[in-house]
């Protein structure tokens, strides 16, 4: 039976550490094991994927990566720009992760990742968690299970199977005010829609085949349909993440 991945504690933005590197150890003590260097915008650590100019990892970011490596916190570049992500791969002494994103060959968005970047990530021992958030899916809420699983099969040709997992980005029973806060925070007086639109400003509906964690059974069946065996499916649905974190 394929192994289903469990949840891990992740700091979504770097705000909890403000500009104090000593707070990284504090959030580790509270259970954090993954931390993103950015959300969509520029942070004190690196550039987000929505910035016009990607300045790469900053001096503070370099020191933060060293401290995260020391403690055993995974460097997560899901929302970061491409140059910043390459920098993080180069600077980190341990493999990094893109915990929730999809390849741009399947669905082109600012949050999607290029083949070249994903090849570099896999060669460094890093992990990609495939997102099930509708804005990251081809055809959004109407994305088919077949399309998703066919993408996974093609991605194996790019990255190899050991570096691919699931990072569902699933937000259940949350009000739209949560995603509005995530996009706007306190940095703008204008309304920032992020990956949304005027007609779809809140959380989008999940596809029918992944309404909640029970949808992993559908993914298991879909992966079998496109040719994966039980060992491969176990790897993608959990074992790859388990093996990855053992190196951190």
Please place each PLM-identified region on the residue numbering.
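Single conserved hydrophobic/aromatic residue that forms the stacking wall/gate
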Residues: 1-8, 12
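Active-site beta-loop-alpha junctions enriched in small/polar residues
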Residues: 13-14, 40-42, 73, 78-85, ...
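A conserved active-site cap/scaffold subdomain adjacent to cofactor or substrate pockets
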Residues: 122-142
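Glycine-rich phosphate-binding "P-loop"
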Residues: 44-55, 205-208
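Histidine/acidic residue-rich metal-binding segments in metalloenzymes
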Residues: 19-33, 50-97, 110-126, 146-162
């Amino acid at each position: 039976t394929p192994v289903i991945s469990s949840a891990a504690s992740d700091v979504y933005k770097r705000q909890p550490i403000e500009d104090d590197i000593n707070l990284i150890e504090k959030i580790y003590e509270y259970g954090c094991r993954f931390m993103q260097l950015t959300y969509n915008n520029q942070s004190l650590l690196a550039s987000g994927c929505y910035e016009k100019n990607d300045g790469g990892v900053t001096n503070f970011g370099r020191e933060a990566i060293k401290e995260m490596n020391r403690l055993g916190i995974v460097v997560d570049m899901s929302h970061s720009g491409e140059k910043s992500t390459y920098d993080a791969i180069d600077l980190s002494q341990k493999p990094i992760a893109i915990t929730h994103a999809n390849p741009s060959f399947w669905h082109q968005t600012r949050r999607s990742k290029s083949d070249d970047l994903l090849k570099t990530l896999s060669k460094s021992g890093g992990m990609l968690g495939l997102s099930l958030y509708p804005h990251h899916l081809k055809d959004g809420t109407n994305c088919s299970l077949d399309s998703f699983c066919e993408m996974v099969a093609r991605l194996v040709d790019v990255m190899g199977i050991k570096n691919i997992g699931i990072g569902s980005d699933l937000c259940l029973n949350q009000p739209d005010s949560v995603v509005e806060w995530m996009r706007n925070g306190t940095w703008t007086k204008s309304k920032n829609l992020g990956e949304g639109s005027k007609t779809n400003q809140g959380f989008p509906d999940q596809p029918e085949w992944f309404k909640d964690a029970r949808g992993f059974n559908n993914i298991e069946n879909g992966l079998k349909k496109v040719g994966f065996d039980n060992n491969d499916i176990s790897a993608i649905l959990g074992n790859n993440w388990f093996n990855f974190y053992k190196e951190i």
